[in-house]
Swiss-Prot record:
One of its GO terms (biological process) is translation. GO terms for molecular function: rRNA binding; structural constituent of ribosome; tRNA binding. Part of the 50S ribosomal subunit. It comes from the Bacteria. This is Large ribosomal subunit protein uL1. PROSITE patterns: RIBOSOMAL_L1. Binds directly to 23S rRNA. The L1 stalk is quite mobile in the ribosome, and is involved in E site tRNA release. The gene is rplA.
Length: 241
């Protein structure tokens, strides 16, 4: 057995699989069981009781994480004229129009988020096959198709992330790095949870959040008590559930 396998088994042995952990307790345990030697990512995964094949059960939106993700996103903006200048001034990493659209169509993907002005969406729409599968296609519902490109860039750079339930009814959120203070990770988790609950489709029946788990880049998943929506910074407090 490899040293890596032994480390994972030892980490997994510290987790009670019959228990749903409070967020603060899960964060501390995730750090304790992380086997990476670098500043790993902390992620939360939700299994939702929705059928994403049905339009009225799609869960999609954005959330502003109060403490960001620990990574500054590279933002590409499709804009011209004054709006292009505003995007650059706001800190956009890549700004352009026709030539840039052509570059992306040929496979340029050195960015994490895309913003476009409404007047260019007729052309940007042709990039659906490239951007769509990667969750990068600009959309008015997520604020990434907008005339106010400066605000969109500032929001994304400040920790705003976009999410969408996948075909298996799962949602994944990066809520920070293992170097983050425990409180910051829990507060980021709370912001994500609050937004997911707010977006519950009226057509969804039965239990909405079926499962939730927190993990690090190279660590085991820790079952979360997603029913706990208040007093998230308390480890053990049954009255807070």
């Amino acid at each position: 057995m490899s040293k890596r396998s032994k480390s994972l088994r030892a980490a997994d042995a510290k987790i009670d699989r019959d228990k749903l952990y409070a967020p603060l307790e899960a964060v501390r345990l995730a750090k304790e069981t992380s086997t990476s030697k670098f500043d790993g990512t902390v992620e939360v995964a939700f299994r939702l009781g929705v059928d994403p094949r049905k339009a009225d059960q799609m869960v999609r939106g954005t959330v502003n994480l109060p403490h960001g993700t620990g990574k500054t996103a590279r933002v590409l903006v499709f804009a011209t004229g004054d709006r292009a200048e505003a995007a650059t001034a706001a800190g956009a990493d890549i700004v352009g129009s026709d030539e840039l659209i052509d570059e992306v169509s040929k496979g340029r993907l050195d960015f994490d988020a895309v913003v476009a002005t409404p007047d260019l969406m007729g052309k940007v729409g042709r990039l659906g096959r490239v951007l769509g599968p990667r969750g990068l296609m600009p959309n008015p519902k997520t604020g990434t198709v907008t005339p106010d490109v400066a605000k969109a860039v500032n929001d994304i750079k400040g920790g705003k992330i976009e999410f969408r339930v996948d075909k298996h009814s799962n949602l994944h959120f990066i809520i920070g790095k293992t170097s983050f203070d425990d409180t910051k990770l829990v507060e980021n988790y709370g912001a994500a949870l609050e937004e997911i609950l707010r977006l519950k489709p009226s057509a969804a029946k039965g239990r909405y959040i079926k499962k939730a788990a927190l993990s690090t880049t190279m660590g085991p998943g820790i079952p979360l008590d997603s029913n706990r929506t208040r007093n998230l910074l308390v480890e053990e407090d049954p009255a807070a559930v």
